[in-house]
């Protein structure tokens, strides 16, 4: 009877020991803030891609979080809280309106145009333990759509015209989201191969 509790304790300890998996990597991914060398539109595009990337990683089943630090800050700080870190190392966005048509009468008019947005990004994946670069990939996506781009009001003596920039912003957001979705797929494929 005295041996039964000891035997039970040994069985429970052995079961707990086998439950520890030191080989499989976790699903915790930190999304790093872009380096400070980016300004203006590049910084905004990089931040937008990072936001969408975190959302796409969460949809894919990862425990993704915003680190609120750059890679340089993380490398100086010895503590790491993720299995992998993702950084949007570079981003670029171009776009424009290659053509359109004006519709209206003598008082009111609307320009309807083709709006094109192209977004490219370099995404880097770092090991969470050593902070070494383990994978780098370049992505680019384009989105286009037809939308009203300006409104005009006029008469016989005066004519006023105002642009509607939101249509271009929407296309850039769609392209940034497409880049982030592709980046999440690439990260998931790399993790499965690891």
Where are these regions (language model features)?
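Sec-dependent N-terminal signal peptides
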Residues: 4-13
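A structural "domain/chain start" motif
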Residues: 18-71, 76-77, 161-194
């Amino acid at each position: 009877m005295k041996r039964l509790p000891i035997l039970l304790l040994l069985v429970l300890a052995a079961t707990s020991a086998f439950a520890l998996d030191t080989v499989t990597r976790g699903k915790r991914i930190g999304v790093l803030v872009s380096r400070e060398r980016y300004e203006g539109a590049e910084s905004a595009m990089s931040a937008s891609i990072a936001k969408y990337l975190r959302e796409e990683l969460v949809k894919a089943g990862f425990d993704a979080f915003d680190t609120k630090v750059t890679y340089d800050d993380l490398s100086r700080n010895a503590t790491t809280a993720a299995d992998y870190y993702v950084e949007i190392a570079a981003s670029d966005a171009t776009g424009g309106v290659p053509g359109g048509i004006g519709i209206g009468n003598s008082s009111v008019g609307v320009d309807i145009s083709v709006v094109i947005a192209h977004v490219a990004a370099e995404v880097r994946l770092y090991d969470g333990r050593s902070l070494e670069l383990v994978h780098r990939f370049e992505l680019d996506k384009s989105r286009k759509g037809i939308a009203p781009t300006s409104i005009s009001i006029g008469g016989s003596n005066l004519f006023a015209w105002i642009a509607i920039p939101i249509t271009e912003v929407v296309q850039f957001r769609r392209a940034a989201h497409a880049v982030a979705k592709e980046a999440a797929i690439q990260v998931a494929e790399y993790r499965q191969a690891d």
